[in-house]
UniProtKB/Swiss-Prot annotation:
Gene from which this protein is expressed: cheB
Reactions accelerated catalytically: [protein]-L-glutamate 5-O-methyl ester + H2O = L-glutamyl-[protein] + methanol + H(+); L-glutaminyl-[protein] + H2O = L-glutamyl-[protein] + NH4(+)
Superkingdom classification of source: Bacteria
A Gene Ontology cellular-component term: cytoplasm
Protein name: Protein-glutamate methylesterase/protein-glutamine glutaminase
PROSITE patterns: CHEB, RESPONSE_REGULATORY
Any one GO BP annotation for this protein: chemotaxis
Occurrences of domain Response regulatory (ranges): 5-122
Gene3D superfamilies: 3.40.50.2300, Methylesterase CheB, C-terminal domain
Function: Involved in chemotaxis. Part of a chemotaxis signal transduction system that modulates chemotaxis in response to various stimuli. Catalyzes the demethylation of specific methylglutamate residues introduced into the chemoreceptors (methyl-accepting chemotaxis proteins or MCP) by CheR. Also mediates the irreversible deamidation of specific glutamine residues to glutamic acid.
Primary location: cytoplasm
EC class (word): hydrolase
Family annotation (Pfam families): CheB_methylest, Response_reg
Catalytic center residues: 165, 191, 288
Length: 350
């Protein structure tokens, strides 16, 4: 079996050693080299031609983001960022994902050895997914305002329910940016750790006509608003309070190894919204959301899955399609328009 070749770049010798220990403990991957900074890494990339790079975001001699941007322009390769769990770390990590990084893992604030070893399976899963990921070309920065679509109508009854994982931060941005301010309410579960979703919501809010926020327990769901499940600690559910939709956040065990889980949100939407919802499953590894999307379809919702060609990782959509949960398979660039088209359809389903 061919092993996944990994190059670890981090200014901390402790982190380099721990990452090497963790990665080499899995039989399908190995660390071929480590580097204390991007300048050393540049030479090691030429020498070893690694399959995946793990990259610290803050390092001496060259900033991790600067190096990532140069790398994705000149020698694109799968990168998993290693970030500190701070507000600044969250903002930098989101920028790294925009620049083309596949995913990220966090350094624990205290007890770094125990924290990273506890993350062993997560780190290995992310490296495996990165090794199979479809790289996005880094487009030149554009300052033009995004083209806004027109909503066929505004209704407090209609809802869009979205789930995503690896590659999802950029996919979600691409879905939300064209939507008009009077779009129906949108609920999103993106696999993300605590401490990152608030920064992600703020970044999206600045880019989109719709209002984007991190969801709060018990809040009423309003048209023109996007509610992002908080990372790490709870599952997000859709419920009813009289004539209104409301959000529930529940601290319970992970589902499909994830918290928040897409399946939890989708199953709750099937029960609370039925045929008034549209379910969308985007890029991501694993199967979270597939069964929930099928439940939504059976409850009368329109459902769609992102197509393989536009996915960073075609895991969750593939599982949903295999179950027969997706009414249609749609390229990422067309999903916003398809959502609005479905909202305008007449019949027993949105």
């Amino acid at each position: 079996m061919k092993k996944i070749k990994v190059l670890c770049v981090d200014d901390s010798a402790l982190v380099r050693g721990l990452m090497t220990e963790i990665i080499n403990s899995h039989p399908d991957m190995e660390v071929v080299a480590t580097a204390p900074d991007p300048l050393v890494a540049r030479e090691l990339i030429k020498k070893h031609n690694p399959d995946v790079l793990t990259l610290d975001v803050e390092m001496p001699r060259m900033d991790g983001l600067d190096f990532l941007e140069k790398l994705m322009r000149l020698r694109p390769m799968p990168v998993v960022m290693v970030s500190s769990l701070t507000e600044r770390g969250g903002e930098i990590t989101l920028r790294a994902l925009e620049l083309g990084a596949i995913d990220f893992v966090t350094k624990p604030k205290l007890g770094i050895r125990d924290g990273l070893i506890e993350y062993s399976e997560v780190i290995a899963d992310k490296i495996r997914a990165a090794s199979r990921a479809r790289l996005r070309a880094l487009a030149p920065a554009s300052h033009a305002a995004p083209l806004r679509l027109r909503s066929p109508f505004a209704s407090s009854e209609k809802l869009v329910i979205v789930g995503a994982s690896t590659g999802g931060t950029e996919a979600i941005r691409e879905v939300l940016q064209p939507l008009p301010a009077d779009s129906p309410a949108i609920l999103i579960t993106q696999h993300m750790l605590a401490g990152f979703t608030r920064s992600f919501a703020q970044r999206l809010d600045a880019l989109c006509a719709v209002t984007v926020r991190e969801a709060s327990d018990g809040e009423r769901v309003l048209p023109g608003h996007v509610y992002l499940a908080p990372g790490g600690e709870t599952h997000m559910r859709l419920g009813r309070s009289g004539a209104n939709y409301v959000i529930g956040l529940q601290a319970s065990e992970p589902v499909n190894r994830h918290r928040p889980s897409v399946d939890v949100l989708f199953h709750s939407a099937a029960e609370a919204a039925g045929g008034n919802a549209i379910g969308v499953i985007l890029t991501g590894m694993g199967k979270d959301g597939a069964a929930g999307l099928l439940a939504m379809k059976r409850a009368g919702a329109r459902t769609m899955a992102q197509d393989e060609a536009s996915c960073v990782v075609f895991g969750m959509p593939r599982e949903a399609i295999a179950l027969g949960a997706a009414d249609e398979v749609v390229p990422l660039a067309d999903i916003s328009e398809r959502i609005l088209t479905r909202l305008g359809d007449r019949g027993h389903r949105v």
